[in-house]
Amino acid sequence: MVIMLKFIDLFCGCGGFSRGFVEEGFEPLVAIELNEDAAFSYALNFNGQIYEKIRPGEFKLKELKGYVGIYPFKFPFEEEDIKWLKRLGTLNEKTKKLSPVVINDDIREIHAIEIEKFIKNKKVDVIIGGPPCEGYTGANPKREKNPYDRLYKDETGRLVLEYIRIVGDLQPKIFVMENVPGIKEVRGAIIKEFREIGYEDVYFNTLRAEDYGNPSVRRRVFVSNIEINPEKTQPKTVIEAIGDLMYKGRDVPNHEFAALPARFRKRVHKLGWGDAFIYFKGANRRLGNYIRLHPLKLAETVMGKRFFIHPYEDRLLTPREQARLMSYPDYHLFAGGIRSCYNQIGESVPVALSRAIARVIKENLK
C-alpha cells in the first residue's frame, strides 16, 4: 500500500500549486482561499467540500453554483455532473480518491486548532502557499517604499506573517512559500520570523517556470526550509502550447472568447508579434498589456489583469489558452465569469513548476 504524502495549501487560489503536487501523488488535506470563485475551482478540481466560518470553531458547508465555460454545476455534484467530470478527466484515478476541506474565508480569521479539527489525526508533511504579492512586486506603483513596511505595515504584505503563523503552529516537515523576487528585500526579517517558529534553515530559491516546460516566462522565489533545485527540461513555445486549440470547438471547458476593447478592434490586424497596445508603469518597470504573442517564443509573464492577443487571430486568448500558457491540463477547470477565470489563472503557480518542486520534495521525504 502506497502512503500518500499529505499537504495543506494556504492562499490556494484555483489550485495551480496543488495541481503539481497532486499529479506527483500528494494528498491535499485542507486549502484556504478567500475568493469564492477560486475556492470553488479548487473544490471542483480536487473533489473537495467548501466550508465557511460562521463563528469561532464552527463552520458550515457552502452550497455553491459554478460555471466553467460550457457546463453549470451545483455543489455537491449530481450524477450527470460526475459523469461529465469523469469523461473530461477532472475526476480521474488520482482526484476521485481525494476529499480536501476548502475553507472559503479570510486566513486571518482561521486558527490552526480549527485546521487540526478538519485533519483530525493526520500528519501534515508539507505546507505550500503563495501569499498575495501586491505588497512586494515592482509592478505595483503604490507599494511601500520601505521594504520592512511591506512586511509589517502593508495589509496585503502582512499576509506573509499569517502563512508563517500557521506553519509555526502545525510544524510540517517542509514548507514552501511562493512570492515575487521583490520579497528578497525583506529576506533577513523573514528568516528571523521562521527561526522564531523553529526552522533554522531558510532558503530563498529563485526559479524560472520556463526552465521546467512552462510556455510563459515567470521568475518566482520559493522560500523553504530545504534547497529546491529541480532538474531542468526543454522549453515550450506559445504555438506548441496553444496551437491545437484553434481547431477545437467549445466542448473544451473555459475556451470562451472575450471581446477586445472597442478602441483596439480596428487596429488589431496591424499589431505585430511582441507588440502591445498599451503600457503601464509599475514601481520600477514598464509593462505591456494586450500583447500580440510571438508563436515561436515564450509568452511574457501571465498576470491576472494582463491580456494577450493570439499570434494568428485578431482576438484575445481564451481563458483555456491562457491556462495552457501556465501549463494547466485541460481537465483543470476554472469556475466563475470570464474575467474571474483570467484572474485566477494569472495569480497562480504554473503547474509545470509546481510539479517540478513536488518531485524535489518527494525525493527529500523518502
Swiss-Prot record:
Query: What keywords are assigned to this protein?
Result: DNA-binding, Methyltransferase, Restriction system, S-adenosyl-L-methionine, Transferase
User: GO BP, one example?
Assistant: methylation
Looking at the record, the residues that make up the SAM-dependent MTase C5-type domain are 5-366
Alphabetical list of Pfam families matching this protein: DNA_methylase
Write down the chemical reaction(s) this protein catalyses: a 2'-deoxycytidine in DNA + S-adenosyl-L-methionine = a 5-methyl-2'-deoxycytidine in DNA + S-adenosyl-L-homocysteine + H(+)
Cysteines engaged in disulfide bonds, as pairs: none
Q: Which GO terms describe its molecular function?
A: DNA (cytosine-5-)-methyltransferase activity; DNA binding
- What is stated as this protein's family in its record? Belongs to the class I-like SAM-binding methyltransferase superfamily. C5-methyltransferase family.
What is the protein name stated in its UniProt record?
A: Putative type II methyltransferase M.MjaORF1200P
Question: Which organism was this protein described from?
Answer: Methanocaldococcus jannaschii (strain ATCC 43067 / DSM 2661 / JAL-1 / JCM 10045 / NBRC 100440) (Methanococcus jannaschii)
